[in-house]
Amino acid sequence: MGLAVREKNGKFRVLTGNKIGSLLLYYILSAMKERGAIPADGFVAKSIVSTRLADAICAHFGVKLRCTPTGFRFISELIEKSHTEQGFGTFIFGFEESYGFLAGGFARDKDAVCAAMLAAEACVYYRSMGKTLSDALGEIEALCGCYNEAVKSYTLSGKEGIERIAGAMAALRSDTPREFAGVAVDRFEDMRSGKAMDYAAGKETESEVTGMNAVRFLLSDGAWICVRPSGTEPKLKLYIGANAKTDEDVEALLNKLM
């Protein structure tokens, strides 16, 4: 589902999947908190390449966040476990940066009808307080900071392309960069092996997500970089996220890392 919001200047701003997911998440948790309805064992799910603004929102509301490999089926697996495994928790909301959203756990895949309903509810909810969705986004930024992300894809076709993609992934694992654009890498995660190196703590740990051919770098300034081969196309995909106090500072960080 796509979404555009009207700004104060009357122009429309088309939101990314990450911004929509964050907006719906903030609305859902805000409304549930007002009613005292956030489950004590409630959890939110998102793919590992989706915005870390969701992490900040969940931390604000004291709700557990679970990350998954890319592909909504992995979020669906968590929903299934919430129904079949005692003590696993109660699913609240899940999303991917690729415009997939789901609440409630009645379905097992991203649901545009459900997402459109939530967006309409959010409009009414904020309008009842004299606010717009644009105001709500500003409220989130004031509370959690400004976050933005970028994705770059490199098409590498044929047998040579497959070999180049495999070679790039192997190089990142064997000769791991320790900095990007002068910013130190605090943590490196290899999601295929499930191992991670926490450079800040000086010890090896486990990656947040496993079972995925991807690597992730967490930088000392809060930015992150994830690299993975596409599962459906001959592409190497690069995901970058950053956060700062202002949108201008975030864009500057992203441009530096790109």
Model-derived segments and spans:
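Ser/Thr/Gly-rich flexible loops in soluble cytosolic domains mediating phosphotransfer, phosphorylation
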Residues: G17-A37
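Phosphate-binding and adjacent anionic-ligand microenvironments
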Residues: L3-R13, A31-R228, K235-Y239, T246-L254, ...
